[in-house]
Amino acid sequence: MSVSIRAGGSSRDVNSVVRLHRRVYAGEYGLARSFGRDVARRLAELRRGGWPGPGEGLWLAELGDSVVGSITLNRVGGGMGRLGHLVLMPEARGSGAGRRLVEQVLEAARAAAYERLELATFSDLSAAGSLYRSVGFVNVSTERTVRWGRRMEWQLYELEL
C-alpha cells in the first residue's frame, strides 16, 4: 500500500498532528511531555489567527486509513513563511512521503509568492536535515540548548524562493 498526501485543516486533522508528534518525538527522541503540549498550543494559536488562510496549509500523509505524517505552512509576514510540524511514523519512512510533503509546502509557498521560508529543527533529526538541504534550505544558525527536557543542537534553516 502506498502513502497518499492530502490537504487537511479540520480539528480532527490537527489532533492527528498533535498525536503524531507526541508518539514520535517522545517515543523515539525522549522529549518531555511538554513538547506535545507545545505543539498543541502552537497549532491552537495558529487556528485562532485564522490559519490556514490563503497561502497556508496543513497536509497529511496517510497509509490506508491511518495518518502517518504531517507538515504545515504558515505566513510569518514580510514575504516569509514557516514550514513546520514535519513528522513521519516509522512505517512511512523511506517511502518518499517526507519529500512529497516538503515539496507540497514549496509548491504552495511559491504559488502564494512567498520570498523566503524558515524552519526550526534539532540535529538529531538528521534525515530531515538532509531532506531540507537537498531542496535548498541552508542552516543559518545552530544553538546548543536544553528544550523539552533534553540537551540538543537547535537549528534554524532558511530557503530563498
Regions found by a protein language model. Name each.
Residues 10-12, 115-161:
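C-terminal "cap" of GNAT-fold acetyltransferases
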Residues 3-91, 99-104, 108, 112, ...:
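Acetyl-CoA-dependent GNAT
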Residues 95:
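Flexible nucleotide-binding loop
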